[in-house]
Amino acid sequence: MAGHSKFKNIQYRKGAQDKKRAKIFTKLIREIVTAAKTGSSNNPENNPRLRNALTAARSQNLPKERIDKAINSANDASNTENYMEIRYEGYAPSGIAIIVEALTDNKNRTAAEVRSSFTKYGGSLGETGSVNYLFKHCGVIQYLSNIVSSENILEAVMEVDVDDITSDDTIHTIYTDIENFSKVLEFLTGKYGIPEDSYIGWIPLNTIIIDDKEKAEKLLKLVEVLEESDDVQRVFSNYELSDDVYAIIQGA
């Protein structure tokens, strides 16, 4: 797998996300409610998806009272709000593949918003399945290198079933198959605490290097606009910024 061995794409986007904490909380709450409603139990001990959602919420410092309120809302029989899980796929400029995962209570609204964003920034929305063959669907768990050493991570993953691990000076990324994700996440959380990030997502099999500043800015704007939608949970793509372009954009 490629694209997530370097932290700079993630680091750039995290800076933007930090300015939108309220939107992040909205997405986390929506996932908690959906996980509690659609899982086999609203008890995280018996509901892996809810357990994973709670870990993600805590990694983003979602207040406990808001977590509890979300679970109570899911348990409330009078709450008829239901979210549909929808995946959108398409291409951004420069042939970059994009996968958008959404939780929405109005699929027509969300489809229109996503399509409009692709069109506005020079991309094209395709059919579901049009680009997912360029990615691997798997679990991802990330720890900062200043929190856990490479030696400790390598030692830990010997005890559980993981697909791959990449490390650099900034971050360790552990990849798992979907079936083992919850088990590995629970094991690592017990050993090293809540990770920097954890999710089931789409990781590019290969990446396309963006070495032009204008192309990079247009691509990043599309990703940013997509992520700004309350309905969109995550955006995945197969681009990688070159070192020079990354440095220019960070310094802008």
Swiss-Prot record:
One of its GO terms (cellular component) is cytoplasm. Transmembrane segments: none annotated. One of its GO terms (biological process) is regulation of DNA-templated transcription. One of its GO terms (molecular function) is DNA binding. InterPro entries: Integrase-like_N, TACO1_YebC-like_2nd/3rd_dom, TACO1_YebC_N, Transcrip_reg_TACO1-like, Transcrip_reg_TACO1-like_dom3, YebC-like. It is found in: Cytoplasm. It holds the Pfam family TACO1_YebC_N. Keywords: Cytoplasm, DNA-binding, Transcription, Transcription regulation. Belongs to the TACO1 family. This is Probable transcriptional regulatory protein A1E_02520. It comes from Rickettsia canadensis (strain McKiel). The lineage of its organism: Bacteria, Pseudomonadati, Pseudomonadota, Alphaproteobacteria, Rickettsiales.
